[in-house]
């Protein structure tokens, strides 16, 4: 069976969840441009430094080097400043999107069939509404944004290098593709099983922890504490195993990235040295095309973690959609219609139940003919044997 990065259900669920994030497009575009300029400043810093060192070795007049020296300071300061502002904007976009998604999910759950929620353990529900929503929000900052930056910066770097040496630019483009596309795809397929196992193990860990905390007394009375601890430790072992698998794949990705950088430098030398000997390229330009690739792989190196985040986010989106239901429409939280109170409503809440029957979904009735009237100031106790669902 051919390994896939995402199944069709996961891809569909991820698109569905992203639509509920209601991402501010203009802020995202601003963050994308700032991130591209930040990494572009880093590459420009490396290229300018290479030119400055090579040109200074020829001992020209100081005024010839003054512009380059000032540019080095400019690129160094702007790199840090642009990254800081970009992260402020991008994280605001992601956090606001998570808020929108959670509000929409809560509103949908409040008006949906309670059987879907009751059938889940509390820890599993907590994981889906908590960490799974976070994973979907992280997709914006850790996958979409790095991919856009890598494409923009890579194209700009190759285009600028082509002005000096088309051959070196072609080699750099091939190495960037190897580092930014081929390596992430290979490692993402290897990481998929580890990510799926990790998500399931984290949900099981949350469920086991909630069971231990909330039901400790009942577990102790029935002699099930050791069994609960064993389930908790088993979930931790599964998480650690998935982390080791992801770490191995990440190590291979880092190796391919570093190897691509080395190939780009060696390729630039193999193309540039004959060009210098043929007086097609200057010695200073040779230093630029050789050293620029050293700072050109910063954006493509982020694609490995971006692909891993893609897998995690798609799995999380699928779990959230399974909670709501694949066919259940979800309205944005701000568009939910609020039901007005009756005209004769009192200022204090009053809960009344008449001939109420209680039971689990598809199970026997536990209580029938229950009449209940709860008003402020009145105490009502719900009593019964352990395990009936009080």
Residue ranges and their predicted role:
Residues 88-103, 107, 145-149, 171-217, ...:
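Cytoplasmic coupling helices
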Residues 2-7, 19-82, 162, 167, ...:
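Transmembrane helix-loop-helix hairpins at lipid-water interfaces of multipass membrane proteins
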Residues 23, 28-37, 68, 142-197, ...:
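Transmembrane helices of ABC transporter permease
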Residues 340-390:
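ABC-type nucleotide-binding domain
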């Amino acid at each position: 069976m051919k390994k896939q990065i995402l199944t069709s259900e996961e891809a569909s669920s991820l698109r569905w969840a992203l639509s509920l994030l209601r991402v501010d497009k203009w802020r995202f575009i601003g963050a994308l441009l700032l991130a591209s300029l930040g990494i572009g400043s880093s590459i420009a810093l490396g290229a300018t430094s290479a030119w400055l060192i090579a040109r200074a070795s020829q001992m020209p007049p100081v005024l010839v080097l003054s512009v380059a020296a000032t540019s080095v300071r400019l690129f160094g300061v702007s790199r840090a400043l642009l990254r800081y502002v970009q992260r402020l904007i991008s994280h605001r976009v992601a956090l606001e999107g998570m808020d929108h998604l959670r509000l929409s999910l809560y509103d949908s759950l409040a008006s949906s069939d309670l059987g879907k929620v009751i059938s889940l353990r509390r820890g599993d529900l907590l994981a889906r509404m908590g960490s799974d929503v976070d994973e979907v929000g992280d997709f914006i900052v850790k996958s979409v944004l790095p991919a856009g930056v890598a494409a923009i910066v890579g194209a700009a770097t190759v285009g600028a290098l082509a002005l000096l040496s088309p051959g070196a630019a072609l080699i750099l483009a091939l190495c960037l593709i190897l580092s930014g596309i081929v390596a992430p795809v290979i490692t993402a397929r290897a990481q998929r099983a580890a990510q799926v196992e990790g998500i399931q193990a984290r949900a099981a860990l949350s469920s086991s922890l909630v069971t231990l905390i909330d039901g400790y007394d009942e577990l102790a009375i029935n002699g099930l504490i050791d069994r609960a601890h064993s389930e908790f430790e088993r979930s931790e072992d599964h998480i650690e195993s998935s982390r080791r698998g992801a770490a191995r794949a990440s190590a291979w990705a880092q190796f391919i990235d570093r190897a691509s950088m080395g190939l780009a430098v060696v390729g630039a030398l193999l193309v540039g040295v004959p060009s210098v000997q043929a007086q097609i390229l200057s010695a200073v330009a040779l230093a630029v095309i050789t050293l620029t690739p050293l700072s050109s792989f910063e954006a493509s190196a982020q694609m490995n973690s971006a692909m891993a985040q893609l897998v995690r986010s798609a799995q999380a989106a699928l779990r959230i959609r399974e909670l709501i239901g694949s066919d259940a429409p979800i309205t944005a939280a701000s568009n939910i219609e609020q039901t007005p109170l009756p005209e004769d409503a009192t200022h204090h809440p009053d809960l009344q139940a008449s001939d109420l029957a209680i039971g689990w979904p598809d199970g026997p009735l536990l209580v029938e003919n229950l009449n209940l009237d709860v008003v402020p100031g009145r105490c009502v106790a719900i009593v019964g044997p352990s395990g009936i669902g009080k």
